[in-house]
């Protein structure tokens, strides 16, 4: 069953020889959150047949006096190159990394004899978390809110400075004419998802033009999943979360943004056929992985 879903989801990628597959994957406390071995996280990456992965929550965690740093072993098991961005962010690549920005936010990757792309990866700040604020779910010492204006204000307070730093680096490498990718757990939904149409359908409480995704859109970064699946009501593409609490607000927080190339497919890897295009069971993370396929 899993194999059949995999073949369907990957068919648009496999028949295009100039395709590069890019994924975003929050591995949940360096694989410790799901209480499964690191090899299960590697299986998720392997099942997607991806080429480049932005990893979030790869921090070294200590449990029972033992320090866990599983990302290097995952990269080695897959035969991938590894770039440590710091602060728990990693970029894994089937292709060699040949350069990086001074900030280490992004790397230049050689995907062919004369073909290069830039890959950025981020994990934007997690609190305050506006979907909880809007829905009366306690999370940190922050007030509940009711309006789009309040949601945008708190989102900017939490993430705007970091978004601006990434924008500057991305705009700089764009000048070279290369394809550019940005993966990440934004800890903030997309302005393409929380539309008035989605609010009218009861999917989200109100319309919100979320500022992080909007800011990247304004510099020419496109949302690959929403490009392939433009209907935010019929195909919400939830990546948060495979392990919902009773009060959970399901959402799409994990993104593969792109510029300078064409997206041909985008799919979700997760825990079940009901939620995902590619299934890995047991599933090791509290975020589903998103993978997109590109031609350049």
Regions found by a protein language model. Name each.
Residues 2-3, 9-76, 116:
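N-terminal, active-site-proximal structural segment of metallo-dependent hydrolase catalytic domains
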Residues 17-21, 48-52, 78-81, 113-117, ...:
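Loop/turn elements at helix/coil->beta-strand transitions in domains of secreted/extracellular proteins
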Residues 25-27, 58, 124, 185-186, ...:
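Active-site metal-binding loops of divalent metal-dependent hydrolases
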Residues 34, 52, 56-137, 269:
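Structured beta-strand-rich core segments of catalytic domains in phosphoester-bond hydrolases
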Residues 37-41, 49, 67-74, 88, ...:
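Stable alpha-helical elements in mature extracytoplasmic
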Residues 101-104, 108-111, 170-181, 187-296:
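Metal-dependent phosphoester-hydrolase catalytic domains
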Residues 132-156, 197:
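A solvent-exposed, charged loop/short amphipathic helix patch at secondary-structure junctions
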Residues 150-177:
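A long, amphipathic alpha-helix that forms part
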């Amino acid at each position: 069953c899993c194999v059949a879903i995999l073949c369907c989801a990957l068919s648009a990628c496999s028949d295009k020889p100039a395709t590069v597959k890019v994924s975003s994957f929050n591995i949940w406390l360096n694989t410790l959150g799901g209480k499964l071995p690191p090899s299960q996280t590697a299986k998720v990456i392997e099942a997607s047949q991806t080429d480049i992965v932005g990893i979030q929550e790869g921090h070294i965690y200590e449990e029972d006096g033992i320090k866990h740093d599983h990302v290097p072993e995952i990269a080695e098991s897959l035969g991938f190159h590894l770039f440590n961005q710091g602060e728990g962010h990693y970029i894994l690549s089937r292709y060699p990394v040949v350069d990086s920005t001074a900030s280490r936010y992004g790397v230049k990757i050689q995907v062919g004899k004369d073909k290069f792309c830039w890959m950025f990866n981020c994990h934007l700040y997690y609190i305050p978390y506006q979907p909880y604020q809007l829905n009366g779910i306690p999370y940190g010492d922050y007030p509940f809110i009711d309006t789009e204006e309040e949601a945008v204000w708190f989102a900017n307070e939490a993430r705007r400075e970091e978004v601006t730093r990434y924008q500057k680096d991305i705009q700089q490498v764009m000048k070279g004419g290369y394809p550019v990718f940005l993966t990440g757990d934004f800890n903030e939904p997309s302005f393409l998802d929380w539309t008035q149409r989605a609010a009218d359908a009861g999917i989200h409480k109100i319309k919100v033009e979320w500022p992080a995704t909007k800011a990247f859109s304004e510099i020419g970064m496109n949302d690959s999943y929403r490009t392939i699946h433009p209907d935010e009501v019929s195909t919400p593409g939830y990546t948060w979360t495979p392990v919902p609490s009773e009060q959970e607000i399901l959402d799409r927080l994990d993104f593969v943004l792109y510029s300078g190339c064409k997206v041909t497919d985008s799919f979700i890897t997760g825990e079940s056929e009901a939620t995902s295009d590619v299934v890995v069971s047991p599933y090791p993370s509290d975020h589903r992985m998103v993978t997109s396929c590109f031609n350049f």
